[in-house]
């Protein structure tokens, strides 16, 4: 089974830009929280989250086209590779998210971008971010405008969950690990 340590080792040579590393970490820790919600292996889901943008920095226009083979060669399970590929469903490929792992990654990828933007605006970072504040910012299409809200809502629907519930789970998971992805604020 893929460990977080191994995922970080695999990601290190491919993901070197700070903003992408921070994004990977945010997705990683939000995925851990989703795993806890679904009573799944937290570290495994974190590891998949850590690798979700494996080829993005080097191949942004061909994102996910250069993921499967190198990860397969590194011994990553097919189920994990499929989960990683599925977060590009409808945008980069036709690998539809089916499992809770896949649906969560599909949803959390964009969702964490808005959560991160909310946290960066606050003196205490994510530590005092409440779901209601996130929901207010989510409705403002100009805030974190590059985050695909339609995709997030589609993912929540796939999961059979309300946006506020998924956001709360992810915010709490990101709070637990706020220091590493630099979400602790300025105060």
What residue spans do the PLM features occupy?
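C-terminal binding/interaction regions
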Residues: 131-132, 139-172, 181, 185
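Structural signal for hydrophobic packing residues in well-ordered secondary-structure cores
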Residues: 14-15, 31, 35-38, 74, ...
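Metal-centered catalytic cores of metalloenzymes
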Residues: 3-18, 29, 89, 95-96, ...
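Divalent metal-dependent catalytic cores for phosphoryl transfer on phosphate-bearing substrates
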Residues: 38-143, 153
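Acidic/His-rich, divalent-metal-binding segments that scaffold phosphate/diphosphate chemistry
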Residues: 1-59, 68
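Predominant activation on well-ordered alpha-helical scaffold segments within soluble catalytic domains
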Residues: 8, 12, 28, 32, ...
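Conserved active-site and cofactor/substrate-binding residues in soluble primary-metabolism enzymes
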Residues: 2, 22-26, 62, 99, ...
């Amino acid at each position: 089974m893929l460990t977080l340590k191994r995922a970080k080792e695999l990601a290190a040579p491919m993901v070197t830009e700070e903003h992408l590393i921070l994004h990977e970490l945010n997705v990683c820790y939000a995925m851990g929280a989703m795993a806890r919600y679904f009573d799944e292996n937290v570290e495994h889901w974190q590891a998949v989250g850590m690798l979700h943008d494996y080829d993005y920095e080097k191949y942004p226009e061909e994102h996910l086209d250069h993921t499967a083979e190198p990860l397969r060669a590194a011994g990553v399970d097919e189920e994990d590779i499929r989960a990683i590929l599925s977060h590009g469903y409808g945008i980069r490929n036709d690998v539809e998210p089916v499992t809770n792992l896949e649906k969560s990654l599909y949803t959390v990828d964009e969702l964490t971008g808005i959560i991160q933007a909310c946290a960066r605006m606050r003196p205490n970072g994510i530590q005092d971010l409440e779901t209601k504040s996130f929901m207010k910012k989510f409705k403002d299409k100009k805030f974190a405008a590059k985050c695909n809200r339609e995709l997030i809502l589609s993912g929540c629907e796939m999961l059979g969950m309300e946006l506020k519930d998924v956001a709360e789970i992810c915010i709490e998971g990101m709070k637990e690990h706020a220091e590493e992805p630099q979400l602790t604020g300025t105060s």
